[in-house]
Each structure stands twice: as structure tokens, then as C-alpha cells.
Amino acid sequence: MGARRLGRELALQMLYSRDYAAGEAAPLLELVLDESEPGAAAGRSFADDLVRGVLEHRQEIDTAITGASKNWSIGRMARVDLSILRMAMYELLFRSDIPKNVTINEAIEVAKKFGTEDSPAFINGILDEIASTLPDKG
């Protein structure tokens, strides 16, 4: 598994856990990271960036998700799906070094692993809607 995929999976677990625990996400990183995993250090760094970015820009991210999710309030979304969307939205809005199609494809792959049967299509629909309104990165 690549370092960024590992980082996304770690970040998802931290963001999801943080929704249910009062406190910081950093201690959770120790619980979910297997140091022997190839790419663990780079994955940890990327996960840390994603989590901090989502937390710092959460209001703007949630506003964008709400605007693109027709008939779905954030409160009705599955927590795993919402965490994946927040993570991907941070990448789309604030990480110019990651192409939009890579962000969307990675979010779909993470959703296949951690979400429900309907999660990949749901996440793809919202992210495609948002990505179509953003300028190309480059």
C-alpha cells in the first residue's frame, strides 16, 4: 500500500474516532498506525496533514459538502462517508499538489474498504459535483 493511501486510511480512522471522542486526534494516531507497515512514516505525516487540515477548515468544508449534497444534510450522512468526504474536500480545496481525479479515485477506494455498499457512489456523486466547480490544478 502506498504512503498516501495509508495516510488517507489513517486519517479516516482518526476523523471518524474524533467524532465520537472528546479530545485530540493525535493520540489516536498511535492506536491506528502499525509502525512496521511499509511507508508508515510518510503515511503518518500525510495523515497528520489531512486531519489537521480538515479540523482547521471544517466549516468551509462542511459548507461545500452541504451545497453539493442534494436532499442530504450532514446530520443524515453516515459518519464514515462524512469523514471520507471531509478528507477529500480538504484535498480538493487546499492541496494544489494532488490532482482532482486522484483525490476522487482515492476517496472512492477508501469508501469501498470502510463504507457501505452505497458509499462509493454517494461519495463519487458529491465529489464530482464539487470538483466540476473548481478550477483545474496545475
Swiss-Prot record:
Q: Keywords of this protein's UniProt record, alphabetized? A: RNA-binding, Transcription, Transcription antitermination, Transcription regulation
Q: Which domain of life is it from?
A: Bacteria
Q: Tell me if RNA-binding is a UniProt keyword of this record.
A: yes
**Annotated Gene Ontology cellular component terms:** cytosol
The entry lists its GO molecular-function terms as: RNA binding
Which InterPro entries does UniProt cross-reference here? NusB-like_sf, NusB_fam, NusB_RsmB_TIM44
The biological processes this protein is annotated with in GO are: DNA-templated transcription termination; transcription antitermination
Is the NADP keyword given for this protein? no
Role noted for this protein = Involved in transcription antitermination. Required for transcription of ribosomal RNA (rRNA) genes. Binds specifically to the boxA antiterminator sequence of the ribosomal RNA (rrn) operons.
**Per the similarity annotation, which family is this?**
Belongs to the NusB family.
The protein in question is named Transcription antitermination protein NusB
Species:
Geobacter sulfurreducens (strain ATCC 51573 / DSM 12127 / PCA)
What is the taxonomic lineage of the source species? Bacteria, Pseudomonadati, Thermodesulfobacteriota, Desulfuromonadia, Geobacterales
